Amino acid sequence: MQTTIIYITGVYDTLDLFTQELKNAFETLGYASFTYDARLEEESKQALIECIEEGTKKGQRFFGVTFNNLGYNLALPEARTETGDACSKQNMGYSPKDINSSREPNLWETYEIPYINILMDHPFHYEKPLQNAPDTSVVLCTDRNHVHYIRRYFKNIRYTDFLPHAGVELGSRHKPLAERGIDVLYAGALPIYTVAKMIPDLSSIPEVDGEEMAQVVLSELVHHPDRTTEDVIEEYLKYKRNDISEQRIHEIIVQMRFIDSYATSFFREQAVRILVENGIRVTAYGTGWDQCEWSDNPYLVYGGKVLAPEILPLMNDSKIVLNTMTWFKAGAHDRIFNGMLAGAAVVTDDSTYLRREFTDGKELVMFSRNEIRTLPDRVFDLFGHMQSTQRMADCGYQSAKEHHTWKSRAAWIREAWM
């Protein structure tokens, strides 16, 4: 029986890169592909419906595999839901209540297609899509804490699980570290310069003083950086108001999620700044690095903003790839695995997941956010012992190649959810 996987592209270059890697991986496992291009919405939807209806007649199976809720609300055209249509909603398991509802018929629900939704960010960024997720959803989170968050606050989602980030390799022959031109590469924006649109009217939270809450929560995260943003917000709310409901806690967490980006930005900037101020040359790409008060430091090389695929060749020419988490405490980031697959020495802040998967100094270097002041010494040590650094990079490459590619993730999805 042929199985076709439906992908959605044409919205974000980073997600297109991940999607192409997953598509390649599933095709090597024997799955057929259909790619819905969001830039050609009507043509893509028509072609998708025809593909599903023709395939269903032949007994084929379909799955949607996508990122960050792309296509969650794909709806059928009205003409296809009228009585006598090949896809009668009553025949597809809809109740009279569903049929009389004003809600547009969801494509995934109508055709009973599992919608496998991989979240690359914290679920609190996706309140509306997750509350309105198709009934056929399987939500895969890249941090174990996010799985708990989904189970607690999104009771409508029946299936959720943990799927770590994965890496992409460009080419198969990688230069030795000694021959590479970039000393330390940081590829990622400073969120503090792009987060303004997320900040709510802090006076609109009647239960507490919003400005005070923002300051207290951010301070707690900075001083105790192993805590999650949602836990600290909840702790503050319950300290101030012991009668606050579960639903209201969730609503305020969503409103105050910008604090997560502030904390991420604080440590990201701190990691790069402490290196350049200690005479280590860092090449940084992404929004915001040219707006810091210390941006004129001669050891900071700012490369501007580039698309996701353009980062991979830069990693291939980097001795060290530096990563800081997007406040993930029980997950990873694709920068880590991309850097390993580029044959670079990866230096990253730790997480419970990374500590289980790797050994500090064997496949990569891990540092605690509480000990960020030791970071320059760790990096100087790598440059001072290039033979052992090369061995670590080689070990990291082998580990990522065997366990942390999108091919590995596709194999897991197949076993667990297909």
Spans of features found by a protein language model:
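Conserved beta-strand elements of the Class I
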Residues: 4-7, 185, 345
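Extended catalytic core of nucleotide-activated donor transferases of GT-like folds
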Residues: 5-9, 16-153, 168-173, 303-310, ...
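Catalytic binding pocket for nucleotide-activated donors in carbohydrate/polymer assembly enzymes
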Residues: 9-10, 17-24, 29, 34-41, ...
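Nucleotide-sugar donor-binding catalytic core of glycosyltransferases
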Residues: 9-12, 18, 153-329, 351-354
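Short, hydrophobic beta-strand segments that form beta-sheet elements in well-ordered domains
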Residues: 35-36, 116-119, 138-142, 162-163, ...
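Short, surface-exposed amphipathic charged segments that create phosphate/polyanion-binding patches used
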Residues: 130-134, 174-184, 380-383
